[in-house]
Every structure is written in structure tokens, then in C-alpha cells.
């Protein structure tokens, strides 16, 4: 049983980047798809696709950029210890070279976008 599907998703992407794999398939969830869309928008991924394996059973196919831009994905807010930040406390990852992903009242978004919109929320991931 997977207790933290988001951490499992992050590990799968990070392991694929280390192994220089082009694509991975993970069990689908709405939150994983939204996180992948933010990573796609920020240029870390090439393509994402929702695939139906069987009736009402889906997988998320994630295609990484060719030279893997991801060196580390760190899960910040965990099921046992949630981390919430206001827009003034959103961290600057590696002086702007990385991004953080937040879950806000307006959806899942990158930290710099949330800061610009003056939105705080749950700090999900740091990618660099």
C-alpha cells in the first residue's frame, strides 16, 4: 500500500531522470496530473498523457525532456507534517534556478506565480 502517492510520483520521475529514461507510467490521480502540468509549463517535462488501461483504470504517461533538467525533487509537505506558507514566505529555490509547487485556493501552481498573485498555500514540492 502506498501511503504517499505524490512522493512515489516524485521518486519515479527522479529515478527516470537518473537512469536517463525518456518516459514513465504511473497510476493516475488528479493531483499528479496537475503537478505534471505545472512541470510541463515550467519546462521540466516534454509531454503528459492520460491513458486508459482498463475500464475506469487510468495511468499517467510522463515524457521527460531529453537532457534531464531534474536533478532532485524534494517532497516538502508530507502526510504526517503539512507545511503551509503565506505568499511572503514562499521559498526561492536555488536562487531562482529551481521551482516550488504549491496547492493554493486557485489550484496547483508554481511558487513564483503564486507569489505574483499574492497567494499562499500548502508547499508540496521543490524541484531543482
Curated annotation (Swiss-Prot):
Q: Which gene encodes it?
A: rpsH
What are the alphabetically sorted keywords of the record? Ribonucleoprotein, Ribosomal protein, RNA-binding, rRNA-binding
Where are the bilayer-spanning segments?
none
Q: Which Pfam families does the record associate with it?
A: Ribosomal_S8 (PF00410)
NCBIfam families reported in the protein's UniProt record: PRK00136.1 (NF001109)
Organism this protein belongs to: Methylacidiphilum infernorum (isolate V4) (Methylokorus infernorum (strain V4))
SUPFAM superfamilies assigned to the protein according to its UniProt record, in alphabetical order: Ribosomal protein S8 (SSF56047)
Tell me how this protein assembles.
Part of the 30S ribosomal subunit. Contacts proteins S5 and S12.
Instruction: Identify the GO cellular component terms for this protein.
Output: ribonucleoprotein complex; ribosome
Q: Which PANTHER family match?
A: 40S RIBOSOMAL PROTEIN S15A (PTHR11758)
MF terms (GO), sorted A to Z = rRNA binding; structural constituent of ribosome
The role this protein plays is:
One of the primary rRNA binding proteins, it binds directly to 16S rRNA central domain where it helps coordinate assembly of the platform of the 30S subunit.
Query: What's the protein called, per UniProt?
Result: Small ribosomal subunit protein uS8
* Keyword Electron transport part of the UniProt annotation: no
Amino acid at each position: 500500500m502506498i501511503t504517499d502517492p505524490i512522493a512515489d510520483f516524485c521518486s519515479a520521475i527522479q529515478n527516470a531522470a537518473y537512469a536517463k529514461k525518456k518516459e514513465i507510467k504511473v497510476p493516475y490521480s488528479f493531483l499528479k496530473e496537475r503537478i505534471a502540468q505545472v512541470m510541463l509549463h515550467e519546462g521540466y517535462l516534454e509531454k503528459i498523457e492520460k491513458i486508459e488501461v482498463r475500464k475506469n483504470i487510468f495511468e499517467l504517461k510522463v515524457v521527460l525532456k531529453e537532457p534531464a533538467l531534474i536533478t532532485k525533487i524534494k517532497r516538502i509537505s508530507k502526510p504526517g507534517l503539512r507545511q503551509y506558507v503565506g505568499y511572503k514566505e514562499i521559498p526561492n529555490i536555488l536562487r531562482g534556478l529551481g521551482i516550488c509547487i504549491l496547492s493554493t485556493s486557485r489550484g496547483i501552481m508554481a511558487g513564483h506565480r503564486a507569489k505574483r498573485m499574492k497567494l499562499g498555500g500548502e508547499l508540496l514540492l521543490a524541484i531543482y
